[in-house]
Curated annotation (Swiss-Prot):
Name of the protein described by the UniProt record: Aconitate hydratase, mitochondrial
Organism ancestry: Eukaryota, Metazoa, Chordata, Craniata, Vertebrata
Binding site for [4Fe-4S] cluster: 385, 448, 451
Family indicated by similarity: Belongs to the aconitase/IPM isomerase family.
GO MF annotation, one: 3 iron, 4 sulfur cluster binding
């Protein structure tokens, strides 16, 4: 077959002056597969172009890149109502990705649907269940042994229903997606909040709950509230110690943890070209920490280089032909615009306890002294889905190499997490891994590990005040090691490496000196490393399982006595009545993430067993009544006890309950267990000042009522000992508030209004008891 460019030239001559887009015609002749693993699933830029043109004609204005990709995947572009921040869009994603902790519940729900095969390309990635304890291979062997039942379930379910399966040790889902599945213009949903990582390759990649994934795998259009678009214009260029991570650390400081809610963050401007493709992925990945729906960069030559180096030059060539649809239109409108001069940007470090508390590295030491944060760094950790690229490892190794040249090793413990088997094998071949070991590092398994709390930490006791510095994305209280007194900071991997060598937050590598083994002072030079290996990537071990062509004989077994897996029972339908005298299970004080609602770490092993995982319901949330975690008053016995035990007591005695929350309730992970658990234990509504996007959708999917105070000050009117009645459900309608009657123990009452974001389809989920119940109703 002729080279792609030659085919284009011939078609141009053949078409002459006829008004066709050359690539649209070429798509008929030179189909390009979405990935090497699915040779019969093709990229449909022709359909993307057609849909964009329909929408452009309707809206009659320039489009942002986000709009092009999102609207280009509309189920009905000719008739879909489109209004940013208001209407719900019905979309057709190109593919689904699931990590092993969330895939269990997603596949259990898909099995319940009764469908024979997934309708779109889908994959499962084993990365969340591997605990960091001793180091790479030993931890991997241990995980395979402990989680054999779950891995077998996921592998056989994947084989049965046509889902690709990436075995334990293959790497972190988002790195695997970037290496194999993401491409410019793709619409991908993943059951992990850091799915936006794929925006570094020009795709719209969105984190969702498992129920959303089930809809898409079932071939049902996926609903998303039409996102607003926040533009971040980048000028200047990165240099020295400043890295791509500093861009998102700066943006997080500007927008805060909820500033991106309901919006796509779209980076653009001349500064983009100074950032590598994997650097763009880092920025998009951590956009989850500002609540953004996703983040995206425009297609450019850095993405083309990455596609070519990862064996996908054919996709890059096709993207070149359709580039007009993979970049924003000139003059497009952003709902908010932020400008950052990369030439003036300084290295940042954010934390502790929240990823939006931003400090220049030069200032964090003095701030820590003032605030009483521990200055000594106990552990430095690099890697994770945010920062585990070849370039990241190379820049960290460049710092480590300088220390070694002066006879130094890390003063702090130091761990390295490769993002994938391909990255691990390549950094071993090119010597980076050995340099990082020589400086005192331990190379962990290709998995999430300490970033999600899978860390058997031995150097401290629970409650001991200490500081760790990571290149991760999230630093909520107790997230990494379950110790609420661990002060976790996030920064770039090269800054982590420098700080681990110095051992203190007071060290600024841009200005400060270290003392070598010979007693002489020296300063670390800004690291420099290749963004991609000069030779080809080393793929390492084969860790992929293709689904068989014929799966008719494939069995998927779930033992009724299993403590790890449990088939799902349908939730009860709405009984047609208002919710009377709801007991308040807990009134939450302050930040309440999905980690607080459904903890990870040791609880990950129960992610496929709803009843067992429900024993962690809200154990991290702070009760406003007593200022304690996992201690609430039982309204019947008047005794204080654990939240899950109290919820089970209420369920056993037929007492329906509600949770009262604060701002941005449910921020963080996409885990739908944080919605399944309250539903399973008898919850009916969650009332807050505001919700994080994914969690709000997950609650709706499970038949719960996520409601917000029409007046946020009404949060203060409710006391943990009150009872609530929610009225107006018989006339439940989009945009129409519900009424809440607060009944105080002294007999007095107050009436407040509660808002919601339900549309007609979502109201049907509530009436049916869940989105899955509604799907089954529609199949009859």
């Amino acid at each position: 077959m002729a080279p792609y460019s030659l085919l284009v030239s011939r078609l141009q001559k053949a078409l002459g002056a006829r008004q066709y887009h050359v690539a649209s015609v070429l798509c008929q002749r030179a189909k390009v597969a979405m990935s090497h693993f699915e040779p019969n699933e093709y990229i449909r830029y022709d359909l993307l172009e057609k849909n964009i043109n329909i929408v452009r004609k309707r809206l009659n204005r320039p489009l942002t890149l986000s709009e092009k990709i999102v609207y280009g995947h509309l189920d009905d572009p000719a008739n879909q109502e489109i209004e940013r921040g208001k209407t719900y869009l019905r979309l057709r994603p190109d593919r689904v990705a699931m990590q092993d902790a969330t895939a269990q519940m997603a596949m259990l729900q898909f099995i319940s649907s009764g469908l024979p095969k997934v309708a779109v390309p889908s994959t499962i990635h084993c990365d969340h269940l591997i605990e960091a304890q001793l180091g790479g291979e030993k931890d991997l062997r241990r995980a395979k042994d402990i989680n054999q039942e779950v891995y077998n379930f996921l592998a056989t379910a994947g084989a049965k229903y046509g889902v690709g399966f990436w075995r334990p040790g293959s790497g972190i889902i988002h790195q695997i997606i970037l290496e194999n599945y993401a491409y410019p213009g793709v619409l991908l949903i993943g059951t992990d909040s850091h799915t936006p990582n794929g925006g570094g390759l020009g795709g719209i990649c969105i984190g969702v709950g498992g129920a959303d994934a089930v809809d898409v795998m079932a071939g049902i259009p996926w609903e998303l509230k039409c996102p607003k678009v926040i533009g971040v214009k980048l000028t200047g260029s990165l240099s020295g110690w400043t890295s791509p991570k500093d861009v998102i650390l700066k943006v997080a400081g500007i927008l805060t943890v909820k500033g991106g809610t309901g919006a796509i963050v779209e980076y653009h401007g001349p500064g983009v070209d100074s950032i590598s493709c994997t650097g763009m992925a880092t920025i998009c990945n951590m956009g989850a920490e500002i609540g953004a729906t996703t983040s995206v960069f425009p297609y450019n030559h850095r993405m083309k280089k990455y596609l070519s180096k990862t064996g996908r030059a054919d996709i890059a060539n096709l993207a070149d032909e359709f580039k007009d649809h993979l970049v924003p239109d000139s003059g497009c409108h952003y709902d908010q615009l932020i400008e950052i001069n990369l030439s003036e940007l300084k290295p940042h470090i954010n934390g502790p306890f929240t990823p939006d508390l931003a400090h220049p590295v030069a200032e964090v030491g003095s701030v820590a002294e003032k605030e009483g944060w521990p200055l000594d760094i106990r552990v430095g950790l690099i890697g994770s889905c945010t920062n585990s690229s070849y370039e990241d490892m190379g820049r960290s190794a460049a710092v480590a190499k300088q220390a070694l040249a002066h006879g130094l090793q890390c003063k702090s413990q130091f761990t390295i997490t490769p993002g994938s088997e391909q990255i691990r094998a390549t950094i071993e071949r090119d010597g980076y891994a050995q340099i990082l070991r020589d400086v005192g590092g331990i190379v962990l398994a290709n998995a999430c590990g300490p970033c999600i709390g899978q860390w058997d930490r031995k150097d401290i006791k629970k409650g001991e005040k200490n500081t760790i510095v990571t290149s991760y994305n999230r630093n909520f209280t107790g997230r990494n090691d379950a110790n609420p007194e661990t002060h976790a900071f996030v920064t770039s991997p090269e800054i982590v490496t420098a700080l681990a060598i110095a051992g203190t937050l007071k060290f600024n590598p841009e200005t400060d000196f270290l003392t070598g083994k010979d007693g002489k002072k020296f300063k670390l030079e800004a690291p420099d490393a290749d963004e991609l290996p000069r030779a080809e990537f080393d793929p390492g071990q084969d860790t992929y399982q293709h689904p068989p062509k014929d799966s008719s004989g494939q069995q998927v077994d779930v033992s009724p006595t299993s403590q790890r897996l449990q088939l799902l029972e349908p939730f009860d339908k709405w009984d047609g009545r208002d919710l009377e005298d709801l007991q308040i299970l807990i009134k939450v004080k302050g930040k309440c993430t999905t980690d607080h609602i459904s903890a990870a770490g040791p609880w990950l092993k129960f992610r496929g067993h709803l009843d067992n995982i429900s024993n962690n319901l809200l154990i991290g949330a702070i009760n406003v009544e007593n200022g304690k975690a996992n201690s609430v008053r039982n309204a019947v016995t008047q005794e204080f006890g654990p939240v899950p035990d109290t919820a089970r007591y209420y369920k056993k005695h037929g007492i329906r309950w509600v949770v009262i929350g604060d701002e941005n309730y449910g921020e963080g992970s996409s885990r739908e267990h944080a919605a399944l658990e309250p539903r399973h234990l008898g919850g009916r509504a969650i009332i807050t000042k505001s919700f994080a996007r994914i969690h709000e959708t997950n609650l709706k999917k499970q038949g719960l009522l996520p409601l917000t105070f029409a007046d946020p000050a009404d949060y203060n009117k409710i006391h943990p000992v009150d009872k609530l009645t929610i009225k107006g459900l018989k006339d439940f309608a989009p945009g129409k508030p519900l009424t809440c009657i607060i009944k105080h123990p002294n007999g007095t009452q107050e009436t407040i209004l509660l808002n919601h974001t339900f549309n007609e389809t979502q109201i049907e989920w509530f009436r049916a008891g869940s989105a899955l119940n509604r799907m089954k109703e529609l199949q009859k």
